[in-house]
Amino acid sequence: MKNESREFEVELELKARVATRDIDDIMCTALEGGITGWCRAAKPVGKRLGEYGHEQIARGGSLVLYDAESSDKWELTLNKFLRGLALAIESGVSVTIDAESGYIDTSDVDGECADMIIRYALFGELIFG
């Protein structure tokens, strides 16, 4: 038998865990530069649930994000954020998941990655880029 190179594909079901601090980290990264190319402002809906705006989502609140070039606006909720995170991971966005604990490692989430998570959350796809 020859030494031939073959490739095999396996299908995986992946579960990732995300803690409040992880959501806060991703939201902070997004709001401080990740989404600023297309989003001019973010405002909490109702009562502010944390000390900072980026803490709103993980605590069950929502943020209204305002388009940089039009009057369009979108509401980001925890459910949308989690859906966006899942879509981003499924689409190959570079998010590291610890094999033992299942928690995501936010130290790898830069502005571009955070931006993609938020765009998947709001639009279900990557628009604006």
Predicted regions and their residues:
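Short, compact, well-ordered microdomains
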Residues: 106-128
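Short, surface-exposed beta-strand/loop "edge" segments at domain boundaries and coil↔beta transitions
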Residues: 66-80, 128
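A short, flexible low-complexity segment enriched in Lys/Arg and Gly/Pro that occurs
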Residues: 95-110
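Long, contiguous N-terminal structural blocks used for assembly/anchoring
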Residues: 1-68
